[in-house]
Amino acid sequence: MTESNDTPIQPEAGDERQHRRIKSFVMRAGRMTEGQQRGLDQGAPLYVLPLADAPVDYDQVFGRSAPRSLEIGFGMGHSLLEMAAAAPEQDFIGVEVHRPGVGALLNGVLTQGLTNLRVYDCDAIEVLNRCIADNSLDRLMLFFPDPWHKSRHHKRRIVQASFAELVRSKLKVGGILHMATDWEPYAEYMLEVMNVAPGYRNLAEDGKCVPRPAERPITKFERRGERLGHGVWDLKFEKLA
């Protein structure tokens, strides 16, 4: 999940590439398993959505009106599959640029026969800007994004003031931005960004992090980290207006 997010940071003025948006993901080639290739071959025509030039009518896409969540950077798709299977009354949209991950998710969708999940295999910020109508999402999830540890790479982090504002514009009033990270300095950084972002309320009682919500599945990576004494920090912010 850590290499698939995108951030709307702009290069500094005077940069010869200032027309290009700095991205927080790095495209890496990955070897496809048989199942992942099956997912792409059979699932993509059914479940992968193209970038649109106008907001998409997801009621038409899903054939119903239902609570709608979007996850940026779903990695291999295990958590998103589990959430979609556990909540058939809700609709889910996943965004991921890593092709093996997209294939793995789609293979799971086919195997489980899910109908409440659709996928974009492209830049998440492009999806938000071009496809998602304002005030339309009930929840946006960002689990374990790349923290870009080095200071000179912090500009690549997806969580920035401009990202918070873009997400706020897409959430319904009362909608939730749910983030999780396994690196405490990034959790602190997220808090710094969100605490000054207008139009949000931190749902943590202590104004910091919330206990792990039951609706967020625990990944194998997270379980391994827990055995080693590593922490995970969940942050939830509600859109006020």
From Swiss-Prot:
Known EC number: 2.1.1.33
Alphabetically ordered keywords of this record: Methyltransferase, S-adenosyl-L-methionine, Transferase, tRNA processing
Gene Ontology MF: a single term: tRNA (guanine(46)-N7)-methyltransferase activity
Any Gene Ontology CC annotation: tRNA methyltransferase complex
Region (Disordered): 1-20
Pathway named in the protein's UniProt entry: tRNA modification; N(7)-methylguanine-tRNA biosynthesis
Catalytic activity: guanosine(46) in tRNA + S-adenosyl-L-methionine = N(7)-methylguanosine(46) in tRNA + S-adenosyl-L-homocysteine
Short name of one Pfam family: Methyltransf_4
Binding site for substrate: K150, D182, T219, K220, F221, E222
Residues that hold S-adenosyl-L-methionine according to the record: E71, E96, D123, D146
NCBIfam families according to UniProt: tRNA (guanosine(46)-N7)-methyltransferase TrmB
Protein name per UniProt: tRNA (guanine-N(7)-)-methyltransferase
Lineage: Bacteria, Pseudomonadati, Pseudomonadota, Gammaproteobacteria, Pseudomonadales
